């Protein structure tokens, strides 16, 4: 199963009440990307909706918040375990791979063995890169098309 380019709410599998969220809908460079509860308010919802664009002839994607239009990027391009994800005008490309479970995916940095990881259920926990752990559900994500919300 693969992900179709489009716009999604992306929820962590381990912490099902936490979505990928651009903190405070802040368009400033290096604004933290966090796990946050669903925020269905007119001013805050677009920062939890992510448009996936597939790069031509690849299985690589960019992820961009609907509002504001900031891309997911690894802070300072520091592609190491524990690095924070931030909003940026420049994307860090990712691969989105089925985890073998119905509707569950791992978002990875291509060819590096690092995946987007939500370390805690606490609201506003920064999403970081973590070494891929096939047994860890906090590295798994469910994608819900915004047309289905």
From Swiss-Prot:
GO terms for molecular function: carbohydrate binding; protein homodimerization activity. The keyword NADP does not apply. The keyword tRNA-binding does not apply. A carbohydrate binds at residues 21, 24, 39, 47. Changing residue 55 to R: No effect on sugar-binding, but loss of dimerization, hemagglutination of human group A erythrocytes and toxicity to Jurkat leukemia cells. The modification N-acetylserine is found at residue 2. InterPro entries: Ricin_B-like_lectins (IPR035992). The N-terminus is blocked. Unchanged hemagglutinating activity after 30 minutes incubation at temperatures up to 50 degrees Celsius, then at higher temperatures activity decreases. 14% of the initial activity is retained even after heating at 100 degrees Celsius. Homodimer. This is Ricin B-like lectin. It comes from Clitocybe nebularis (Clouded agaric).
